[in-house]
Regions:
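Active-site His/Glu-centered metal-binding helix of metallohydrolases
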Residues: 110-119
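Short alpha-helical functional segments enriched in proximate histidine and acidic residues
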Residues: 117, 130, 158
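Bacterial Sec-dependent N-terminal signal peptides
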Residues: 1-28
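Membrane-interfacial alpha-helical segments at the cytosolic side of multi-pass membrane proteins
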Residues: 122-131
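Acidic/histidine-rich, surface-exposed loop or edge segments in extracytoplasmic proteins
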Residues: 104-107, 132-133
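Active-site scaffold of zinc-dependent metalloenzymes
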Residues: 81-105
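Metalloprotease/metallohydrolase-associated module, dominated by Zn2+-dependent proteases
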Residues: 29, 33-84, 93, 136-190
Length: 190
């Protein structure tokens, strides 16, 4: 019986209102050494401006930045030639990497930032579903990582589409349409 343990791997997405996403990939060692505050995604808890604790540069032109991450941990066991996988997938908000400029922000921008977090949660759910449906071989670590990378690519494309179609929250009609669409998806796929 072989056992493979992978602790955590996270990719942060920093989404700026009125800006483009930036990525910061952390190695497992960096992730393990971090003791950073996070807020797990929950349908019962919405972001508040007080959650945005990071500092912005005076030269920064964006109104706000939301840093979210999808992380995973898994254990793989092979018994009688079959792979058994226990996996945990989390979607989290990183307060110290997220910031806002009070003079530029309002409830519409906060709603826009919340939706970035909600979109990340939808992709965490897609990741869980693909893992549950996948038939793993002896290359579990690489297969999980490949699925993870594909989900992150899809997330990046989706986040960019969201910002483009809402014009970074400036198109209120589109923002409201997106709010409704994502809320429906979250309700259907818990």
């Amino acid at each position: 019986m072989g056992t493979l343990r992978i602790l955590f791997f996270t990719l942060f997405f920093c989404i700026s209102a009125f800006g483009l996403p930036q990525e910061e990939e952390l190695s497992q060692e960096e992730e393990l050494s971090q003791k950073e505050e996070t807020i797990p995604w929950s349908a019962d808890r919405k972001l508040q401006w007080s959650d945005f604790k990071g500092s912005y540069f005076k030269t920064e032109w964006a109104a706000a930045t939301t840093a979210t991450g999808i992380s995973y941990a898994f254990t793989a066991n092979k018994q009688n030639g079959q792979q058994f996988l226990e996996i945990q997938v989390n979607c989290e908000f990183f307060p110290q990497k997220s910031w806002y400029r009070p003079e530029l922000c309002d409830s519409v921008i906060l709603s826009h930032e919340q939706l970035h977090f909600d979109i990340a949660e939808l992709h965490a759910r897609k990741f869980r579903k693909r893992l549950a449906e996948f038939r793993f071989t002896d290359n579990v670590k690489e297969e999980v990582r490949d699925i993870y990378k594909q989900i992150l690519k899809e997330l990046r494309i989706f986040q960019n589409k969201y910002d483009r179609e809402t014009d970074f929250s400036k198109d209120l009609q589109q923002q409201l349409l997106w709010n409704g669409s994502i809320a429906r998806e979250l309700a259907v796929d818990p």
